[in-house]
Structures are given as C-alpha cells and as structure tokens.
UniProtKB/Swiss-Prot annotation:
Span of domain CBS: 255-314, 315-373
Protein name: Glycine betaine/carnitine/choline transport ATP-binding protein OpuCA
Species name: Bacillus subtilis (strain 168)
Domain of life: Bacteria
Keywords, alphabetical: Amino-acid transport, ATP-binding, CBS domain, Nucleotide-binding, Repeat, Transport
Keyword Nucleotide-binding: yes
Gene Ontology MF terms: ATP binding; ATP hydrolysis activity
Length: 380
C-alpha cells in the first residue's frame, strides 16, 4: 500500500535528517515511528504527504509515485491528525468534520450524513453537530480531529503524536477507542510517537529510528523479545522488557472468569452482604446483558449509606478495562504503572468476560524477573 525506497532528506549545510530509508507498509497496517528527538520520525512522516519534500528516493501509495502527483490533491487523499488538533473555532463540529469532503465537492446532505456516521463511531450523538470546538472537552476535540481525518474515506492516515497533550486517563481511553476504530475501518495508519508504551499498545509493527536511520522494524513482541542492539534495549527500558510466561500470552488465558458482580438496582445492604460472603471489598456493576457499567466498593457505600439506597446511586463508571484478546504484558504494565488492584476484562461490546487482579500477576512477574536465573542455577 505504502512503499518508501531509499528516501532521504538533506537540509542546507549537509545535515541529513533522514538517510536512505526503505520500508514497505501493507494495507490496513498500523505502523508506529518512534525514536529520540531529532531521529527523523516526523520528517519521514511529513515526506509521505509532501509537507516536506524528499531530497532523494521514491515514495509510492498504491503503486503511484507521489512526486508525480499534485501535492494539494495528494494531501486531500491522505488523512492527517496533529497534536494541536487544529479545529477551526468559528466552524461547527459538522463543518470541521466535513472540511475535506467540501473541498472534494461532496453534496451537502452527503457531508452531513457522513459527519453523523462518524460521530456514531465514537459514541457522540448528532446533537454535537451544531456545537463549536470550545464547547467540547479536550478528549472530544481530539476525537473530532480524528474524525475529520477519516471524513473523506482516505485509505491512508498520518498521525503526529495526536494524543500527546491529553491527560493520562483520556489518553488511555482514546488509544483503546482508536485502535478499535482502526480495526473496524481497516485503514492504513502511520503514527508518530515518543511514547514506547503507546507504540506497543497500538502498533502492528514498530519502526525505531536513530539519527535518520531505521534501527529495527518488528512487531511489539519481536522488538520486546529480541532488541536489535543496546540502543534499542535502552530506548525500550528495562521495565518494559519484563516478559510474561511464554505459555501465557493473552489476558483471557489467565483471567478469573467468575468475577463478583452486582446489578445497579440492588440495595446497598445487599451489596455489602455480597462483599462479605465473597470476601471482597469491591464489586463490578453489570446490567442484565452482563455489560460492564462500573464498580462499587465498600468505601463508596460507607460514605453514601445515609443518602443513597441502591448501587445505581453510588457506583463509578470510570474504570480501566482491557479486551480479552489483549496481550498480557499490557495488562501487567497497566496494573503496575497505575497502581490499581484489578482490571476487568471485556469483549468488543463491553460485556464482562473476567478479571485480572494484581495478586494474580505476582507469579508471572516473578517468573519474568527471576525465572532465567533460577534455571541457570539449576544447570550449574
């Protein structure tokens, strides 16, 4: 789908920002460019839509040499998302989303319908169409920035640290949301980031650059298990090199499949009684279809017992979750990094499938850190 052949960028004075890069990207692939500041990751991405002109080499999109195309027309066929979002403050959300379709002379009704379709994909209703950017939160604005890039149905989308300015909770939520969206729409993504956790979480393959050259290309697993050299090891970080047991790769293989749950219509007394019976201090709240709604713990009940009567009055909906097909290492990292006690496991429709607890990860982390040493001692 996207092919870079011996692509270089040399600035005046002879400074090489990018040096003879070769890369093949398949249709529907999610590629992350990552590396230290000045490594050439953003320059490489900007050469793909000719915001920066290559000094030499060739770039092909669907077999066509981009240097033989009008740069303005080229950019209209490529989605582009930046950290600063770049929504026009005087335009409504619908007008912002429809910007490129309007330039492509789509009929007005088709533009409106496309905006409605896209909002639905990120769980935003049609009432947002006539609002202005200042009426939205930072996370909502960034969602609109992503939707604008998708509006004209481009096969390729370039993203330059799009979630870098967001708070950690919003950032994590948008990453999950966008990865799901990418799988659904099967778009080819080139994503620039400085955050290795983000690259590991999102990418099908990671491209690590240093001083304008590619040092290693591989899946997150390949790079974590077999760093190309000392630079890659140091860039990844020792804590990220903690590996899960080789026989336990995905969350669903080791999750507890019978988490303790409660419905929102149960009384606080019933919830406390259930906690006592199951010897737990919190419960996952689900509806009749077993869709996860949030959680309630003993502290919430204690603080609200005089002014609330049912679980639905006190439970919290802001809860970290992972997909049951997620790699186990991502869950290990989330639990350890965020300091949380457990992570609910859900399917694509947010049905509760299980739970991974902090305690259940102790053996896995122990084996990851000490397993090799113990094996070596046993062979001495």
């Amino acid at each position: 789908m996207l092919k870079l052949e011996q692509v270089s960028k040399v600035y005046k004075g002879g400074k090489k920002a990018v040096n003879s890069i070769d890369l093949d990207i398949a249709k529907g692939e999610f590629i992350c460019f990552i590396g230290p500041s000045g490594c050439g990751k953003t320059t490489t991405m900007k050469m793909i839509n000719r915001l920066i002109e290559p000094s030499s080499g060739r770039i092909f999109i669907d077999g066509e040499n981009i240097m033989e195309q009008d740069p303005v027309e080229l950019r209209r066929k490529i989605g582009y998302v930046i950290q600063q979002i770049g929504l026009f403050p005087h335009m409504t959300i619908q007008q912002n989303i429809s910007l490129v379709p309007k330039l492509l002379k789509w009929p007005e009704e088709k533009r409106k319908e496309r905006a409605r379709e896209l909002l639905k994909l990120v769980d935003m209703g049609p009432e947002y169409l006539d609002r202005y950017p200042h009426e939205l939160s930072g996370g909502q604005q960034q969602r609109i920035g992503v939707l604008r890039a998708l509006a004209a149905e481009p096969p390729l989308i370039l993203m330059d640290e799009p979630f870098g300015a967001l708070d950690p909770i919003t950032r994590d939520s948008l990453q999950e949301e966008f990865k799901k969206l990418q799988r659904t729409l099967n778009k080819t993504i080139v994503f620039v980031t400085h955050d290795m956790d983000e690259a590991i979480k999102l990418a099908d393959r990671i491209v690590i650059l240093k001083a304008g050259e590619i040092v290693q290309v591989g899946t997150p697993d390949e790079i974590l298990r077999n760093p190309a050299n000392e630079f890659v090891e140091e860039f990844i970080g020792k804590e990220r090199l903690i590996q899960s047991r080789p026989d336990i790769e995905r969350v669903e293989q080791m999750m507890n499949r019978t988490p303790v749950t409660v419905s929102a219509d149960k009384t606080l007394s019933q919830a406390i009684q259930l906690m006592r019976e199951k010897r737990v201090d919190s419960l996952l709240v689900v509806d009749r279809q077993n869709v996860l709604k949030g959680y309630v713990d003993v502290e919430m009940i204690d603080q609200n017992r005089k002014k609330a009567s049912i679980v639905g009055d006190v439970y919290r909906s802001d809860i970290y979750t992972v997909q049951k097909g997620a790699l186990l290492r991502d869950t290990v990292r989330k639990i350890l990094k965020q300091g949380i006690k457990y992570v609910p496991v859900v399917d694509e429709q947010n049905h509760l499938a299980g739970i991974v607890t902090r305690a259940s990860l102790v053996d896995i982390v122990y084996d990851s850190i000490w397993g090799d040493e113990e094996n070596q001692l046993m062979t001495i």
